[in-house]
Curated annotation (Swiss-Prot):
Its cofactor is pyridoxal 5'-phosphate. Homodimer. One of its GO terms (molecular function) is pyridoxal phosphate binding. GO terms for biological process: glycine biosynthetic process from serine; tetrahydrofolate interconversion. This is Serine hydroxymethyltransferase 3. Catalyzes the reversible interconversion of serine and glycine with tetrahydrofolate (THF) serving as the one-carbon carrier. This reaction serves as the major source of one-carbon groups required for the biosynthesis of purines, thymidylate, methionine, and other important biomolecules. Also exhibits THF-independent aldolase activity toward beta-hydroxyamino acids, producing glycine and aldehydes, via a retro-aldol mechanism. SUPFAM superfamilies: PLP-dependent transferases. Pathway: One-carbon metabolism; tetrahydrofolate interconversion; Amino-acid biosynthesis; glycine biosynthesis; glycine from L-serine: step 1/1. The record marks H229 as: Plays an important role in substrate specificity. (6S)-5,6,7,8-tetrahydrofolate binds at L122, G126, H127, L128. It comes from the Bacteria. Its EC number is 2.1.2.1. Pfam families: SHMT.
Length: 415
């Protein structure tokens, strides 16, 4: 039926092929600094493009609603076993299609509409799914938000006071734009003191945690959710780790609760990524991720920019642009013209609108994947500062773009 030689994307759909080729060129030619993006391996992509995409497999390994699942059972069980080993978890569900759906799965399993949850404020670095009023989590539940103190660290004392006052059923830890280490043990004690579950969303930090360069929340939390891309460098998807006592309700919440048939080709990609993350090379990579982020932040500070929280202890940093009298939206556009990709991001107590912002968020995972070290991280920091010092100067943009081209040529993503 299908001739592999003839059924190529280029032959079947030249328009899609052209868009893919253009995106590949963009990824090779631009320096990627969006903290939630990374480059996955050819092995992971091959798994995602395999015949496993053809197979329906409602249920779980050994308990499927379809026949012919003996081989996809092997794939899913390998993914489960590997991710449990990677993070030291008692149980795992690898079927969530995203980090948001992983969070929804925990909510669906353990909460009822109207229950009180407590999460980090989106305005202070949290995530939409931690109780934002525009998200399902903020519409279905009564939300209490904690945030940062005057030093721009998590205000654990205020969080404890809020928990004592409001008695949430579930406390959410984790962030999407917070650079310091989170004290998961302290948050677990707060949760225990009020009889709340603790759910940690480690989506941004998962790769660092797997390598032991960031605190592991698994020993302290009832549930730990994550994406499988970002710093973990796998396919786009989600995972829930949990204590064994919660495995049955979580599994039921994912299927049949909020999802149908799992994406077995993506689960295969997850399994491959987990195997890669168990390697010594992955630990060395994550150590470089943290070092590159530190060098990048220090370089920006030397050039007159402020890092929210004063520093980074992870892969990510939030840059306050107000001293340069430029918005996040304008900075994103200017840097993009120089082939440096970032995202505009609100800073704590940001006076600008969400589509404008006073900051940008930067991350080091992708540039580290392509081989950048501290010297390149310092160079990138100076290139960013050069653009932000003269964001409307065409000559500056052209000069920086030429230096970016030299860097990306030296360090290709896919050889």
């Amino acid at each position: 039926m299908f001739d592999r030689a003839q059924s190529t994307i280029a032959n079947v759909d030249p328009e899609i092929f052209a868009a893919i080729e253009q995106e590949n060129r963009r990824q090779e030619d631009h320096i990627e600094l969006i903290a939630s993006e990374n480059y996955t391996s050819p092995a992971v992509m091959a798994a995602q493009g395999s015949q496993l995409t053809n197979k329906y497999a409602e249920g779980y390994p050994g308990k499927r609603y379809y026949g012919g699942c003996e081989y996809v059972d092997v794939v899913e069980q390998l993914a489960i076993d590997r991710v449990k080993q990677l993070f030291g978890a008692e149980a795992a569900n690898v079927q969530p299609n995203s980090g948001s759906q992983a969070n929804q799965g925990v909510f669906f399993a353990m909460l009822k509409p109207g229950d009180t949850i407590m999460g980090m404020s989106l305005a202070h670095g949290g995530h939409l799914t931690h109780g934002s009023p525009v998200n399902m989590s903020g519409k279905w539940f009564n939300v209490v938000s904690y945030g940062l103190n005057e030093n721009e660290d998590i205000d654990y004392e205020a969080a404890e006071q809020l928990a004592q006052e409001h008695k949430p059923k579930l406390i959410v830890a984790g962030a999407s734009a917070f650079s310091l280490k989170i004290d998961f043990e302290r948050l677990a004690k707060i949760a225990k003191s009020v009889g709340a579950y603790l759910m940690v969303d480690m989506a941004h930090y998962a790769g660092l945690i797997a390598a032991g360069v960031y605190p592991n929340p698994v020993p302290h939390a009832d549930f730990v959710t994550t994406t499988t891309h970002k710093s973990l460098r796998g396919p786009r998807g989600g995972v829930i780790l949990m204590k064994a006592e919660y495995e049955k309700p979580i599994n039921s919440a994912i299927f049949p609760g909020i999802q149908g048939g799992p994406l077995m080709h993506v689960i295969a990609g997850k399994a491959v990524a987990f195997k890669e993350a168990l390697s010594p090379e992955f630990k060395a990579y994550q150590e470089k991720v943290v070092e590159n982020a530190r060098v990048l932040a220090e370089t920006l500070v030397k050039r007159g920019l402020r890092i929210v929280s004063g520093r980074t202890e992870s892969h990510v940093m939030l840059v306050d642009l107000r001293a340069k009298h430029i918005t996040g939206k304008a900075a994103e556009a200017a840097l993009g013209a120089a082939h440096i990709t970032v995202n505009k991001n609100a800073i704590p107590n940001d006076p600008e609108k969400p589509f404008v912002t006073s900051g940008v968020r930067l991350g080091s995972p992708a540039m580290t994947t392509r081989g950048f070290g501290p010297a390149e991280a310092e160079q990138v920091g100076n290139l960013i500062a050069d653009v932000l010092d003269n964001p409307e100067d065409a000559a500056t943009i052209e000069r920086v773009r030429a230096q970016v081209a030299e860097l990306t040529k030296r360090f290709p993503v896919y050889r």
